[in-house]
């Protein structure tokens, strides 16, 4: 359905970029590759993937998936590595994945999540800097990453690190009256509809904030 939706959207709109992310998208690498293959065929120039890089411990499987990503047309990859991901994700298979990607035609950057700000001197940011050092020998550039916004679980479990006197605004909120990007949820939900029950073009045309 995702592949079909991309084809239909590109038939009606000029799409400049496509990104697959999660959850962890590479748990389903065949789906990710099918999506990027269609994006390539439809002339979408910017094709990105965000992943934590952990979907297998087997080196042959990791190499196989990277080759498939390259062949499907993935242009750039943002690898999420930081204190939060590495609490539960082993670093060795992720580092091997990063090495394989850096040896391919796919541009790769490390994308850490910072707590409060990159400059803030808290234990999570210090740990993130330690994690990033693990990748220094691969000479992979470090991107801007993202800053954790104080809402939901972040506010519940990390609230002590945020200044109660400050007013925070999410950098990820979009104006519902000026939609520049759309995002598909794993269950097919998008905007006010679902592609399992309605055609994507109908959802877009009937959208109301």
Would you name each region that the model predicts?
Residues 143-209:
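Accessory C-terminal segments flanking Radical SAM cores
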Residues 2-20, 28-132:
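Radical SAM/AdoMet-radical enzyme domain recognition
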Residues 24:
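Substrate/cofactor-recognition hotspot
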Residues 131-134, 206-207:
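Residues that form generic nucleotide/phosphate-binding pockets
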Residues 20-21, 51, 143, 150:
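Short glycine/serine/threonine-biased micro-segments
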């Amino acid at each position: 359905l995702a592949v079909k939706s991309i084809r239909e959207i590109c038939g009606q709109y000029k799409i400049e970029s496509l990104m697959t992310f999660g959850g962890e998208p590479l748990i389903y690498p065949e789906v990710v590759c099918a999506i990027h293959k269609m994006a390539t065929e439809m002339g979408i120039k910017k094709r990105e993937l965000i992943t934590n890089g952990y979907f297998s411990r087997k080196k042959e499987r990791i190499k196989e998936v990277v080759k498939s990503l390259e062949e499907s047309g993935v242009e750039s990859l943002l690898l999420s590595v930081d204190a939060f991901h590495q609490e539960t994700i082993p670093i060795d298979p992720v580092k091997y994945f990063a090495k394989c990607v850096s040896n391919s035609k796919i541009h790769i950057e490390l994308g850490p999540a910072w707590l409060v700000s990159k400059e803030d001197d808290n234990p999570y940011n210090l740990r993130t800097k330690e994690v990033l050092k693990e990748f220094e020998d691969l000479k992979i550039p470090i991107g801007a990453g993202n800053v954790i916004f104080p809402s939901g679980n972040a506010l519940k479990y990390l609230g002590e690190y945020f200044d109660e006197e400050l007013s925070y605004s999410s950098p990820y909120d979009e104006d519902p009256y000026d939609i520049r990007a759309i995002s598909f949820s794993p269950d097919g939900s998008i905007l006010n509809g679902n592609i399992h029950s309605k055609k994507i073009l109908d959802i877009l045309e009937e959208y109301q904030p």
